[in-house]
Regions:
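ATP-binding/phosphotransfer module of carbohydrate and carboxylate kinases, centering on a glycine-rich
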Residues: 19-204
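Hydrophobic alpha-helical segments and helix pairs
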Residues: 1-28
Length: 204
């Protein structure tokens, strides 16, 4: 998890975004205004007044930190250099983990696929492009495959495959797979919009 590992994940991105906001003497960044809105505050000055209770609330909810990663990505897309640097560092950290695994498995000379899943990869071109560049440096024949569907799609496909294999579902496998892939995205969009970022409203 994020306390011991998970380098390069959304928790790291959100955490570094929050650190950039509160770092004394830190570079100007649009992340401050994003946090003001995220926390339901009225201004940056209000943010300074609420720093202690806000910190306690954020530390008590790790998902709030991970959700802030979407705001870091938004600022990065708008050209904020602090946000861009956070995403690139996270991608570098993940690439180091991949490099370790590649060397341990002794497959640096192989042509292997790299399937990218998860929110950071799905929603951030900056993150994904940086990751691909870094991995290509130690795995030249890598085939980057960016999956634009959530991980639940893979679980649904695995469940369908098992149901067909066990005889619990008598349907055409290929047709069922295509139907699932076609109907899942709009269904998920209705349940939970992409990059949903719930507000962290302050309370008295």
């Amino acid at each position: 998890g994020p306390l011991l590992g998970d380098r390069g994940g959304s928790y790291q991105v959100g955490r570094e975004g929050l650190r950039a906001v509160f770092r004394p003497g830190g570079a100007p960044t649009a992340l401050r205004e994003e946090l003001v809105h995220f926390a339901g505050l009225s201004s940056v000055d209000h943010l300074k007044q609420e720093i202690v209770p806000l910190s306690v609330r954020i530390l008590g909810d790790r998902t709030a930190v991970a959700h802030y990663a979407a705001l870091v990505n938004r600022c990065a897309r708008a050209g904020d250099p602090v946000a861009v640097a956070i995403l690139e560092q996270a991608a570098d950290d993940l690439s180091e983990t991949i490099e370790y695994l590649v060397r341990q498995a002794d497959v640096a000379g192989c042509a292997l696929p790299m399937v990218g899943t998860g929110g950071m990869i799905r929603h951030s071109d900056i993150y994904w492009n940086r990751l691909v560049r870094q991995v290509t440096g130690f795995l030249p024949q890598v085939r980057p495959l960016r999956q634009d569907m959530p991980q639940v799609a893979g679980r649904a496909l695995a469940g369908l495959r098992e149901a067909i294999r066990n005889g619990a579902c008598h349907v055409d496998a290929a047709a069922s797979r295509e139907r699932l892939l076609a109907t899942l995205p709009p269904l998920l969009a209705e349940i939970r919009p992409q990059q949903e970022t719930p507000s962290l409203r302050t309370t008295r």
